[in-house]
Amino acid sequence: HEIRFVDILNQNNLDDVLKDIKFSNAAWNDDKGVFYKKNSNTDFFAKDSTYQLYYHKLGEIQDKDALIFDTSKDESDFRFFVRENKLFLFETNKEETKRLYHYINLSDETFKIKEFVVPNGNDFSYLYSKEDNVYFTNSKYDWGDVRSFNINNPTEVTSIIPQIYSHLLVDTDFTSEYIICKYRNLGRNYINIHNYDGTFVRKFEAPMGMNFKIRFLDNKTNELYVTFYSYTISYLNYKLNITTGDTNVYYNDFIEPKPTLFPFNHFETKTITYKSRDGKDVPMTIIHKKGIQLNGKNPTLLEAYGGFGSVSGPSYDVGLLHFLEKGGVYAFAEIRGGGEKGRKWHKDGRGLKKMNSFNDFIDAAEFLISEKYTSSNKLAISGASNGGLVVGVAMTQRPDLFKVAVPKVGVYDMIKFEQYTIGKFHLDEYGNPENEEEFNALLNYSPYHKIKEGVNYPTTLIITSENDDRVPPVHSYKFAARLQNRAAQKNPIYLQVKSNAGHYGKISSYEKSVQADAEFYSFVWEHLNE
């Protein structure tokens, strides 16, 4: 990739170009220049890659950029941020067993690197810095808290905002006066505002089933610009005044359709919990038209992600609206491996415990059937990336449970996954095939290896992208070929390869986005109603 620069005030493109950039942010040093991270190897996925931090002064060519930090000797990796007049750099060795913490006072133009120590007993996850105070969350706490220490005296830690049990601290933002904490609890998202001493100021809460994103903070007026959205409601933009608590619509790109076309008020959204086979309460969001009959005959789409501690939330989907309007049911299961119920929820669905994720997903399907939302002959499953793996495991372990499966850009060969592109960075999530115990655990669920002769698997559409450098399409090619090349397979197995597209597809226009939605939901609806 390349980094290019635009003079916003004059609306001019600058001549500066930074090339051979991947997996890097760019952090400004006022308007003088930017810090960026570069890979020593032009093969970005090479195992012997090392990383360097460079400083680019605007107006100079890239060859003159100053080398600030180099990991060539110890083969570590790092993240960096600029806050006020300091650059923070956090270094982790290849085995992720050792961390070092550095900072640079940007007022010193020599950019001298200094090291600081994180107080004992704290699993440090950086949030923000103000003057000489560093704000962080202690990752030992499952739900997330806010703490601080002075960089010149790191032995004393101040607890500012304690964790709230069962309320996940999803994100934080900081203004000159306030700490803004975004929480999530069983389908409800809200913001708590605090002073820097931890004093609670006020709360803003989104309606049930709605998510939101803070787009902009105005330090001068203490206003938040927030976008609200859900599966069935498009983007509603509000301005929230922290000081007064006033809320106002400032821009709304949602043009409400005619009620006869999409009567949004007759959709019901609820977040329930169901019991997993080992007794865990697993959250699941379910959406359908009000007054639906629970007779086991409703076409239903079940999805999940369940990996890397990711916190999944609703996003507006016009294709889903059509599916619901026609009488469909949609469900999203927050299975273990994700981060929806805290850090332990992630740990209990990774590595040697990864099978918990897949069991949770299968248990979600059985719950929907037992509660008469649907039946196995009316149930479709889908997921992307790690969610594609979840679908691949579910359909190969319980082919009797599903009518349709649509895994997207998934990992299916768990014995060789680390040999492809960034697979080596996922050993911590899935396990290492070179370790005997972990190899056996991977082989126990690897979708490609679990395909059996004599089994008729569900009608399946495997979607991949030819230029996917996160999960290369070879996973999908192999999975599709083995499913297709068996005499017992009577249900159709389709492979869709998106050209000139990467891991997230190629949604370069509204028309292509609509086309992708139409293809997906049409496939699901048609085969659920055969």
Identify the residue ranges that each predicted region occupies.
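Non-catalytic accessory segments flanking enzyme active sites
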Residues: 1, 76-93, 98-103, 111-129, ...
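Beta-propeller blade signature
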Residues: 4-8, 50-59, 101-106, 147-151, ...
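A conserved hydrophobic secondary-structure block that centers on an alpha-helix together
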Residues: 1-25, 30-31
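A flexible loop/linker signature enriched in serine peptidases of the S9 family
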Residues: 1-2, 16-22, 38-52, 61, ...
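Long hydrophobic segments that form regular secondary structure
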Residues: 71-145, 149-154, 163, 178, ...
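Beta-strand initiation motifs
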Residues: 10-15, 60-66, 108-113, 152-158, ...
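Active-site-proximal cap/loop segments of hydrolase catalytic domains
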Residues: 332-530
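Cap/lid segment of the alpha/beta-hydrolase catalytic domain
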Residues: 1, 9-12, 243-246, 251-377, ...
